Amino acid sequence: MDLAALRAKTPDHWKLATAIRVLAIDAVQAANSGHPGMPMGMADVATVLFRNHLKFDAKAPNWADRDRFVLSAGHGSMLLYALLHLTGYEQATLDEVKNFRQWGARMAGHPEYGHLEGVETTTGPLGQGISTAVGMAIAEKSMAARFGKKLVDHKIWVIAGDGCLMEGISQEAIGLAGKQELDNLIVLWDNNNITIDGRVTVSDVTDQKARFAASGWDVLSCDGHDAEDIDRALTAAKKAKRPVLVDCKTLIGFGSPNKADSYAVHGAPLGDAEIKLTREAYGWEHGPFVIPAEIKAEWEAIGAKGAAERAEWEARLAALPAGKRAEFERQMARGVAPKLAGAIRAFKKAQSEAAPKVATRKASEMVLAAVNPVVLRNHRRLADLTGSNLTKTSDIEDFMPGNHKGRYMRYGIREHAMAAAMNGMWLHGGVRPYGGTFFCFTDYARGAMRLSSLMGVPTVYVMTHDSIGLGEDGPTHQPVEHLTICRATPNTWTFRPADVIETAEAWELALSSERTPSVLALSRQNLPTLRTKHEAKNLTAKGAYVIAEAEGKRQAILMATGSEVEIALKARALLQAEAIGTRVVSMPCMELFAAQDEAYRKRILPAGGVRVAVEAAIRQPWDRWLLGERGMERKAGFVGMEGFGASAPAERLYAEFGITPEAIAAKVKSLL
């Protein structure tokens, strides 16, 4: 490629794009770690995007009506960091660029939400960014339908690489976006035909443009190193009536004389000798991290070009009726609905009196029917299991093309994209998402669920059919290890409520959470209401509490969750009949119990006596409460699952696997 000709054709563009490239090269070299090739290859596309098309104001990084820019190919993070520094984001200082990938750096190896203003989402696991962006596009459509396009009218731009498009989640996401006709979503494909193993063709033959077209997208193409051609394609993309893929044909490591267009430039520093040659090829005579003042000033002018449009938008917001303005600001700030606690208390009082025997998945549906009128931002999602998960209430319409006021989306069989899109909705602002599937299929959503926890996105995962209690569908659908996986994930609340009252309390906590996602593990089988005396206080908020005290001298403590609390209470009755004083502790959320002070934990789990945990799942997370917290190994036992389940009616399964009142009582007596 003739670099001199390109430089002569668009000299102003060339110097702006070269500033991105050299910052990326220098930062990776200084860190002795990183991915210079992608920023070098996509610098031209990014320059045209930020210079001519992206609606943003670097001095107001949280402006509600800004365009969102998602770097799905997160390994090329220095592309984003260079742009943020050059355009004048306050936190993106040159010192931060020099501190790339170091301890305490805002500029982490892959972009991390919350570390640096201008980073819209955490990316790095390939495919997550493009899928999260679909959720942002959905949230934009939802907010525009509620508040009007004078207040909400922006695009979601994504840079995705070959790896993003190979990941299975990308097909889930693009199929969903195509079905929903998300014309506010534009994906810029860094089509450089390189992976770590070499050419993309060594592992893939997919016609990506045909794939997107078949999924309901418009597809455009451009020369990713021709500024005028890039501008033409992006201008056309903004006018489309469907989501758009722009195929940007690029060279990875553009300008490197010996490493461009090869895997060698993907994930390693260029080295001093190659950097010298590359600078010469660019015509760049400045040293490491040096950006001439006139180029920095031009970039900062690009960063400020949205200020006037933002001021006009703020004037429109200020002109709204006070109530509507306050509601818009509250929703974008992700505030908790002020009437939520009252609605939950009223629901609990009514249900403790009625004492229904219902599955906790049904209890969840009942809670949602009670709180939906006061939590208007709830946007719910289902992976093709509406009738099983029970997350759609009668007052909710479907979100679809032509009805973006709808708050219920049918995802199809796309668990992973559902989870990622929910992350995007919350990150965009204005939507409090929850979505559901069978608990066993959290396996399909794990990557995005982990990012919820890492980013502090308080998504609610409604996971039903939580144990062998689902019965005849068998071990492919019966979760036994999934509670352990969720509990092992940092910054995750895993709720397994025992009845309708605990279900309501779990929902209150999940919808009030600011930075922690929640998993609600809910039963298929009916469970009795255990707490028939109304308690205004949210007992689940403590994570564990005494649901039945020992009569006489306490000799044993039974700990249980969910459907096994009822079984533990029946075991208590058997033991008390033999004068074995037994306390039953319901532990709907281990994480919240662990967060309580030692005095409270000691009151619930005092020293001495036998401890037996009961759960239709594997033992692993229980050892802290059985052996630690003043417990003793010789007096600790577990009644639950040691392997996978089987296909049979639920009652038979509980009997065959020994999760019965009689087995629990026998375990206690064997340890006395």
Swiss-Prot record:
UniProt pathway: Carbohydrate biosynthesis; Calvin cycle; Carbohydrate degradation; pentose phosphate pathway
Any one GO molecular function term: transketolase activity
Residue numbers binding substrate: 35, 266, 361, 388, 465, 473, 524
Cofactor: Mg(2+); Ca(2+); Mn(2+); Co(2+)
Keyword Metal-binding tagged: yes
Top-level lineage group: Bacteria
PANTHER family recorded: TRANSKETOLASE (PTHR43522), TRANSKETOLASE 1-RELATED (PTHR43522:SF2)
Protein name from the UniProt record: Transketolase
UniProt source species: Rhodobacter capsulatus
Encoding gene per record: tktA
